[in-house]
Amino acid sequence: MATESCLSSSQISKVDNEKLVRPKVQLKSLLEDAGADKDVFTMKEVMFYLGKYIMSKELYDKQQQHIVHCGEDPLGAVLGVKSFSVKEPRALFALINRNLVTVKNPESQSTFSEPRSQSEPDRGPGDTDSDSRSSTSQQQRRRRRSSDPESSSAEDESRERRKRHKSDSFSLTFDDSLSWCVIGGLHRERGNSESSDANSNSDVGISRSEGSEESEDSDSDSDNFSVEFEVESINSDAYSENDVDSVPGENEIYEVTIFAEDEDSFDEDTEITEADYWKCPKCDQFNPPLPRHCKSCWTVRADWLPETHSNWENLSRNTRTNPEDTSVTTTPNTTFEKKLSKPSSPLPETDDGVDVPTPPLLRRGSSQEETPELERFNSLEACLPATCLEPCVICQSRPKNGCIVHGRTGHLMACYTCAKKLKNRNKLCPVCREPIQSVVLTYMS
């Protein structure tokens, strides 16, 4: 992009753009360094040569190119600041205006307005009529607004659309050579296109000219001093309200999914090795030692519990072979059999199905049948340690049948109820102070 074509239209209003000014001595020397060769300038030319000077001196920041550092340059002494930003055009215009003197020369104004009038197309009769009725435009607008609210809303939308076109048209850009320049917009071309459209319909032309005049009067400062960082061309798409939907909102919702297992896994237990796993006889699947079922086919593990029936059979056989018991059972007693078959005083049975207490002879026979269980309990007392036969150390009432398991070991020192309470309250094992993994109801056989 050539430096001479950097400034196509000033960011200043029309009146200030056509106003002739004379820079002071210090500012004039800076403009002459940028290539200026005259004494009187327009504001457009002052901005052009000032941008050319900043480009040649490379006073702009390499990272943030809209910031100009002029503290060690004569430009800083002229403007009275060490740095400024082109994003604040009002402040920049105020700094430059201090070093300018207004020149009132109608001849020079006419010479300046001639090329501008040549560059613009001929004005049609619609524009002439709109200029003649400009004095009564405000009254007509008020009447239209009061009579037709829909047309007033349409005018407001078109006026706001023109505001966006003008405010979006000014931008600051840097080409491949990092040239610093201010690019004007398409306000003049769009104004000409609107005036050419007004020739076809005089009423529409009047309303458009009135809307443009009102927007220029009310928004001259905000529109003419807006700065952006992209260059728009004539063929660029117009602003549409649908583009607002594409802009992401401030509030964004993030959905986070956490994957975790619902059940505890035995694979993480460091105390369980592969040697402890058991193999299913049906599907040949290796399973952890604690579950009793296979994970694949749900088959119960063989030898999961001891065979209690065989023990009972062995104990019953031992009691039958005992000579003392056989003497009791084989002794012929006809009177005992008669009393069993024909009791002397038959006992009735209640309607509720509750049996009447048995006579002493029947109790004697049942006690003879319970003798194997007593012998079995006596054998357990002989083989188990004395601490296992003591009551629970916590409640001192129930037997010790609640094994506190932690890892591959456990302690049998409390009943199942007390041990379960310790587990639910997240207490430690009272013996070894280890975390309680589970509580097992223990049967002594």
UniProtKB/Swiss-Prot annotation:
Chain spans, region ARF-binding: 190-279
Ranges for region Disordered: 106-168, 188-224, 313-372
Keywords: Cytoplasm, Metal-binding, Nucleus, Transferase, Ubl conjugation pathway, Zinc, Zinc-finger
Biased amino acid composition, Low complexity: 193-209
Nuclear localization signal (motif): residue ranges: 160-166
Cited SUPFAM superfamilies: Ran binding protein zinc finger-like, RING/U-box, SWIB/MDM2 domain
One record GO biological process: apoptotic process
Residues in RanBP2-type zinc fingers: 274-303
Superkingdom of the organism of origin: Eukaryota
GO CC annotation, single: nucleus
Region (Region II), start-end ranges: 222-306
Cellular compartments annotated: Nucleus, Nucleoplasm; Cytoplasm; Nucleus, Nucleolus; Nucleus
Cleavable signal peptide: none
EC number(s) per entry: 2.3.2.27
Biased composition (Acidic residues): 212-222
Catalytic reactions on record: S-ubiquitinyl-[E2 ubiquitin-conjugating enzyme]-L-cysteine + [acceptor protein]-L-lysine = [E2 ubiquitin-conjugating enzyme]-L-cysteine + N(6)-ubiquitinyl-[acceptor protein]-L-lysine
Biased composition (Basic and acidic residues): 117-132
Keyword Nucleus carried by entry: yes
Polar residues: bias regions: 106-116, 313-335
CDD domains listed in its UniProt record: MDM2 (cd17672), mRING-HC-C2H2C4_MDM2 (cd16783)
Function of the protein: E3 ubiquitin-protein ligase that mediates ubiquitination of p53/TP53, leading to its degradation by the proteasome.
Identification of the protein by name: E3 ubiquitin-protein ligase Mdm2
Organism per entry: Danio rerio (Zebrafish)
Lineage: Eukaryota, Metazoa, Chordata, Craniata, Vertebrata
